[in-house]
């Protein structure tokens, strides 16, 4: 199993042959509740919370995709430390739509992929989910 990725991961480039193979391969979808995703991301991206000014400047990169009002709201949420609200809005209003569009256009088997749902993205929850996926994949 590999995670769906774009051609670039940070400053690294995924080799074309690997990317092409990934995009033609069978897919699975992991659907996590918004609450679980928010909690996971706040924990995983703690460095943004520790440096709100950096996050605020990063929000400016979205200026071609969202209104000035939306960006101002997100910056205010970051400035005031309203992390669950900010992360939830970024997921629902920005990331999710772009991600779905990218997956649908790049991964030929995405639409027909088996979905696995979870509301627990703790280490234990991810371990349980991984075991479910392996069992489901083994019996497929």
Residue ranges and their predicted role:
Residues 1-24, 29-31:
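Glycine-rich phosphate-binding loop used to anchor ATP phosphates in small-molecule kinases
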Residues 20-140:
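Conserved NTP phosphate-binding and transfer environment spanning the P-loop NTPase/kinase superfamily
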């Amino acid at each position: 199993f590999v995670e769906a990725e774009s051609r670039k991961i940070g400053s690294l480039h995924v080799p074309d042959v690997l990317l092409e193979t990934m995009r033609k391969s069978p897919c699975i979808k992991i659907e996590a509740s918004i609450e679980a995703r928010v909690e996971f991301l706040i924990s995983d991206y703690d460095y943004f919370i520790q440096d709100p000014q950096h996050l605020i400047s990063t929000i400016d990169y979205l200026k071609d995709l969202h209104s000035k009002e939306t960006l101002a709201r997100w910056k205010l949420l970051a400035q005031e430390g309203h992390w669950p609200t900010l992360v939830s809005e970024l997921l629902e209003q920005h990331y999710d739509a772009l991600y779905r569009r990218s997956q649908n256009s790049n991964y030929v088997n995405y639409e027909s992929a088996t979905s696995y749902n979870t509301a627990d993205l703790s280490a234990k929850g991810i371990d349980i989910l991984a075991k479910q996926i392996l069992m489901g994949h083994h019996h497929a």
